[in-house]
Regions:
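Juxtamembrane transmembrane-helix boundary signature
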Residues: 29, 56-89, 96-104
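Hydrophobic alpha-helical transmembrane segments of multi-pass small-molecule transporters/permeases
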Residues: 25-29, 57, 61, 95-106, ...
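TM-loop-TM module centered on a large, flexible mid-protein loop between adjacent transmembrane helices
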Residues: 79-93, 247-293
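Membrane-interfacial loop-to-helix junctions in multi-pass transporters
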Residues: 16-21, 50-53, 88-95, 124-131, ...
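Hydrophobic transmembrane alpha-helices that form the core helical bundles
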Residues: 77, 94-125, 132-136
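Transmembrane alpha-helical segments of multi-pass small-molecule transport proteins
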Residues: 26, 98-99, 122-145, 159-171
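Hydrophobic, membrane-embedded alpha-helices of multi-pass small-molecule transporters
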Residues: 20-37, 170-256
Length: 293
């Protein structure tokens, strides 16, 4: 019987594919961690706590670092999905984990579809219901396509970079008190543990933890020989997430510090949208729509 030739792990094509999968995993984790829920929470907590919320951002990044490093290393070294690892450790627990992640993913993605609808509404004025339907159909088409793998990798990277650049633009437009924000990051006037728990639960828990690591499994970047590359990618991913979170916080802080009162309690409240619009006018609203979508 003919045997398959072993993969040359020093060939330029293998190295290029591995680098591509690592970069895609980085941005998949980053974009998953900064969805409609986090954007809305950041706007709400910044409006109520001001610069002191910077400490909550820092705490979420530190916790994120510990969790993501552990999960990425274990999953890629064992070459097993999280539910399979859990079943090996405690028989039956993997099924419970899978059910919890599926349920959490369903709840969060209902929010993501709603956020996509609101994003298209802010970006082009489309009715949020139709925006959600069109976004869901587009997602189904992309993920059901046989040729979607490489397209998804490229799309994730491009959209992640666009998200950072657009938020940077709004941040500079809002002119936040950066010095005060940096001070409050390490020496906050107030520490709200409920706020920190909410932010951490929405950005570290659930399927977000496993998105990047499972993407590496799909691309074959596994084994002890890849541990250094995986650890480096996890660190870079956390840095990208942290950068994006802090830029978003500063963009909204600039608006709040200027004296603008954001509506965070009414039925139609959309504090993040208000902040972007106050910072950069109609352009800011369109940018918010694109980021949310």
């Amino acid at each position: 019987m003919a045997t398959q030739d072993p993969v040359n792990k020093t060939s330029p094509s293998f190295i290029k594919n591995r680098r591509s999968s690592l970069i895609a995993a980085i941005f998949l984790m980053a974009t998953s961690a900064i969805g409609p829920g986090f954007i809305t929470q950041t706007a709400t907590f910044t409006a109520t706590m001001g610069a002191a919320f910077a400490f909550g951002i820092l705490a979420s990044i530190v916790i994120d670092f510990v969790v993501q490093q552990s999960i990425w290393r274990v999953i890629t070294v064992t070459n097993m999905r999280a539910s399979d690892i859990a079943n090996k450790a405690i028989p039956g627990s993997g099924y419970l984990l899978a059910v919890l992640v599926i349920f959490g993913g369903l709840v969060f993605n209902v929010g993501n579809i709603a956020g996509a609808g609101l994003g298209l509404n802010a970006m082009v004025g489309l009715d949020p219901k139709w925006g959600g339907v069109l976004s869901a159909l587009l997602a189904i088409y992309i993920f059901s396509s046989r040729k979607a793998s490489h397209f998804i990798d490229r799309m994730i990277i491009v959209l992640g970079i666009v998200m950072i650049l657009l938020t940077l633009f709004v941040m500079f437009a809002s002119n936040p008190p950066i010095g005060e924000a940096l001070k409050q990051t390490v020496l906050p006037n107030t520490i709200n543990f409920a706020t920190i728990t909410t932010i951490v639960g929405g950005t570290v828990g659930g399927y977000i933890c496993y998105a990047g690591a499972h993407r590496l499994l799909d691309k074959g970047t596994t084994g002890i020989e890849n541990i250094d590359a995986v650890s480096s990618a996890a660190t870079k991913g956390i840095l990208v997430v942290g950068l994006m979170r802090y830029i978003l916080f500063l963009a909204i802080l600039g608006v709040v510090a200027s004296g603008v009162t954001l509506d965070i309690s009414s039925h139609a409240a959309n504090p993040a949208s208000q902040a972007f619009q106050h910072a950069a006018g109609l352009t800011g609203l369109r940018i918010f729509g694109l980021i949310l979508w």
